[in-house]
Amino acid sequence: MKKRSVWGRCLAVLMTAVTLVLPGVQAGAKQSTGTRTLMMDTRSYQMAPGNLYDIKVSVNGANVSSSDAVVYSSRDSVARVSRIAGTDKYRVTALREGTTYVTSEVYGVHASVRITVKKGVQKRGEANRSVTVIGTATSQSEMRAVWIPYMSLDMSGQPDRSEAAFRRKFDTLVSQAKNSGMNTLIVHVRPFGDSLYPSAYYPWSHLLTGTQGTSPGYDPLAYMVQATHQAGLKFHAWVNPLRVSLKGLPKSFSSDNPAVIWKNDASKQNWTMEWNGEWYYNPGITEVRDRIVSGVREIVQNYDVDGVQFDDYFYPTTASAIDSVSYLASGTSLSVADWRRQNINALVSEVYAAVKQTKPAVLFGISPQANLQNNRNMGADVATWGSQAGYVDYLCPQLYVNSSNAVMPFDATAVTWRKLVTNPGVKLYFGLALYKADSNADGGTWITPGSVMAYQIQKSRSLGANGFMLYSAAFLENRQTGSEMAQVKKLLHM
């Protein structure tokens, strides 16, 4: 490390060495193991507004390079960090008085330096940062999941709707996922306020027989969990908590559907919400939240699931008309937007508590939209979920964009989410748009020589994300995505 000239006041000097050892791996093992070592001079600095200095990041180890490192400032308004093109250095620009932490991260290992920007401080020169990482992610430590949406389970239009036919359909999905290197399935079990299992709270899904409320004569969820575990994979039950209908589906509702019962009761008509011909449950009603919580508890209690996941369907609009009656009845002094976020937070925390009280080892996670403003508009308080305990075990934002996206480029958006998830008890996964790979989506920017998915997985790793989820299973073995999946399987050592 280079000698430095006069630096001004130095708050502290500390050499940090971090070694992470994954389960079953011995410290000091060869590079092919999961051992990761990071060494970084975490000297604290003061610098004046307008001053610059460069941070050098060197990365060595199996399957890693300097381009895998991510360096960022916790407060961009105090000091901004940018990579110096063509080098392994990052330039820190002091902007205004305050304190920030500049963090280097590579594959989940990180170290930070505290920077105080203060007027009158002597200008600094170059500061070296040396980072060494050994190893890479393993199939056991990394979430490698694929979503199985309701469309892939739909039997309603099939001439053969038997249990045997359903099993064959699901067995194919399991086989494709395993052959693609996945270790977890995220399976739709409640897409429309219904269920793909015998429920005390929701009607049978129309997906199984063509008619909502009609039993198929077998338990699809029981078989799906069994088949998934027999293949050595994990099973997360995917639940839409509020959505009752979407784009004309289902075509009809059973008489025992709670939404139908409540709509026909004059005193409970505000327990559901309608928007653009679609139907949702109203989370501002305590009894509605209780129903949703009971439905999740039922799954965790009766089935050997490894996790439960909500997706991004919360409030469908910012329009106040959809729940104005319940908002006024609440007597709250909060704005409509804040009241809605309070309702969703209550639902999320209540579901989390129910899961942990029933089976503490079962995970509860949410896969929200990647756009933070959209989340706020929908009542999804992702900043709270990612920073405070008692809400989720993981967040998996749907980063369905690539690096060419003009509004939300993948790399910058991923860094934003990395900064947002600050609670060490909350894991961060990234949802990736396999369905867009090698397609004309987004102006043809996804048509590449099979490299987008592998790049995004590598970038996710470099940011310290705990894994990824692909949308969807229908594209694992698909002519469109063949070259993309070949690169993914190579990356996963398949």
Descriptions of predicted regions:
Residues 152-164, 202-217, 275-290, 333-343, ...:
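The substrate-binding groove and active-site-proximal loops of carbohydrate-active enzymes
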Residues 391-409, 417, 424-494:
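Substrate-binding cleft of secreted/luminal carbohydrate-active enzymes
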